[in-house]
Structure formats: structure tokens, C-alpha cells
A protein has these predicted regions:
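Chalcogenol-based redox active-site neighborhoods
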Residues: 1-155
């Protein structure tokens, strides 16, 4: 997993920002070092291609956007935040973990899923499989209904 920052600010603004956040102390964080690349997009070419310049918001500022792009260059998640609202990094991390879990195990994650929680197995492909799942719950798997079966996570 790699992280890349994109800003419509200049390279010099990036340098000044990186230096300043190392000097500041906020919410117990200090000497913060950004360990991912920041891309200068002063012409807003990338920001425009990804829809980060929102009508009615600003013609010179990009909205706060998060894109999760998988190794095959497929966009898996897009989150847009208004210019006035900061990102929720805990949620971004949770979504990335959920995508990685789903890809690795062919499962889905339910609402409010956290690592270690039970996951949803794919819906049965036939009536016979659905009936078998409903009748044969196990330590590893259980169903709430024919279409909603879970895999227990080992704790």
C-alpha cells in the first residue's frame, strides 16, 4: 500500500508546509514527518481529471479527496470532503483494510466492520447451497438468513 499526496499548490508551498508541520504541536502530535511523496499540480491537470475542482466550491482550490487505487490501477474508493472539513484517517485506514481483506479472502465486510470482526461470505449460488448453509452452521460459519452468512474471525 502506497500513499501519495496531491496539491494544486506550488513546490515551494509544499516545502514550507512540510517544514511548518514539523515545528507545530497539536493533539499530542509533534515533529510530524511526512513520509510520502507530494505531487505539485499547480496547473490543476490531475485535479481536474479526478474531479477535485468542484463547481461552487472554488476555481483555484481542490476539494479534499481520497482515492484508493489498486495495483491494477482500478479506482476502488473515492471520498470527497468539503474544503471546510478534514479527512477521517481512521476511516480511510479501515476502508483500505476492508478492501485488502475482501480481496484476500473473497468476502465482504458489513457496516461498521473493524479488523477482527466477522465477515460476510458470498451469497449462495443455488437453493441447495443456501439450504445447506442454513442447516449446517459451524464454528467457522453461521447464517442469519439464506442470503446473509458470516465467516467467524479467529480471535
Amino acid at each position: 500500500t502506497e500513499l501519495v499526496g496531491l496539491s494544486v499548490d506550488s513546490l515551494y508551498s509544499h516545502i514550507a508546509w512540510l517544514r511548518k508541520i514539523q515545528e507545530l504541536s497539536w493533539k499530542g502530535m509533534e515533529n510530524v514527518e511526512v513520509k510520502f511523496p507530494l505531487i505539485e499540480d499547480i496547473r490543476m491537470e490531475v485535479a481536474n481529471k479526478y474531479g477535485m475542482i468542484q463547481p461552487g466550491q472554488s476555481n483555484t482550490q481542490a476539494v479534499r479527496a481520497v482515492f484508493v487505487i489498486d495495483p491494477e490501477a482500478k479506482i476502488r474508493l473515492i471520498l470527497y470532503y468539503p474544503l471546510s472539513t478534514g479527512r477521517n484517517f481512521d476511516e480511510i485506514k479501515r476502508v483500505i483494510q476492508a478492501l485488502q481483506k475482501a480481496d484476500a479472502e473473497n468476502v465482504a465486510t458489513p457496516a461498521d466492520w473493524r479488523p477482527g470482526d466477522d465477515v460476510i461470505v458470498p451469497t449462495a449460488g443455488s437453493c441447495g447451497t443456501a439450504k445447506e448453509r442454513m442447516e449446517n452452521s459451524s464454528e467457522d460459519q453461521y447464517c442469519l438468513d439464506w442470503f446473509m452468512c458470516f465467516k467467524r474471525e479467529k480471535k
